[in-house]
Design a protein with these regions (language model features):
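Surface-exposed, flexible loop/turn segments at secondary-structure boundaries
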Residues: 18, 38-40, 131
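N-terminal beta1-alpha1 ligand-phosphate binding loop
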Residues: 2-28
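Short, charged, surface-exposed secondary-structure boundary motifs
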Residues: 41-47
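Cofactor-binding loop segments of dinucleotide-utilizing enzymes, especially the Rossmann-like FAD-
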Residues: 15, 35, 128
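Glycine-rich, phosphate-binding/catalytic loops in enzymes
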Residues: 28-31, 101-102
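Anionic-ligand binding patches
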Residues: 2-10, 47-200
Length: 200
């Protein structure tokens, strides 16, 4: 059975182990290459300018894909980005980053506890110097009101791996215990919505 055409070469503009695993499990042949983009600066600028999270996620995904597509004009380059946004008590919309360490992950998870947040997950495809496709998936996840003792046990069990996730949790592992409700495609929560990508 042919799942993928021989051409064009598929390139993932990401070093994310989770995204690579999603593509591998779908039986796709691809190369994963880093895109030298200052994500933090782009994200900070977008937030400061009041750009909606959906537009900011597309902008970040596109920056990654475009950077590699200019070097690899015949390839089909997939760029991805994911933003976590959550309304807070003061009605502001807070944008979260990957925690720097477990102490930061603890603070972040306490801020998300008992709230519903959105994972704005953008995917773009570039080929021949132009964007030819884009998708934005927005799963909604509600954390239960867990105790601090539970949180400390979770952090000890998962360790530094949590710092690789914008949420400070891994839904595909023990992080599932943190939630009372999850809405949206599982692969979108993990950072690469496979259903729309494979339809494209």
């Amino acid at each position: 059975m042919i799942l993928q055409a021989a051409e064009p070469v598929l390139v993932l503009a990401s070093q994310s182990a989770t995204r690579r695993t999603l593509l591998e499990r779908a039986g796709l042949r691809f190369e994963a290459l880093p895109a030298a983009v200052d994500e933090a600066a782009l994200k900070e600028s977008a937030e400061a300018e009041g750009i909606p999270p959906e537009d900011a996620a597309i902008m970040l995904a596109e920056a990654k894909a475009e950077r590699l597509a200019r070097r690899l004009p015949d390839a089909l380059v997939i760029g991805c980005d994911q933003l976590l946004v959550c309304p807070m008590e003061d009605r502001s919309l807070r944008w979260f980053d990957k925690p720097a360490d477990l102490a930061a992950a603890r603070i972040q998870l306490l801020a998300l506890r008992g709230r519903t947040h959105r994972l704005v997950t953008a995917t773009v495809a570039w080929r021949g110097g132009a964007r030819i496709w884009q998708d934005v998936s927005v799963p909604r996840l509600t954390m239960r009101s867990f105790s601090e003792d539970f949180l400390d046990a979770y952090l000890a069990a998962e360790g530094e791996a949590l710092c690789a996730s914008v949420g400070g949790y891994r839904l595909e592992a023990m992080g599932v215990h943190l939630f009372s409700r999850v809405e949206g495609e599982h692969s979108a929560i993990l950072g690469l919505p496979m259903t729309p990508l494979l339809r494209f």
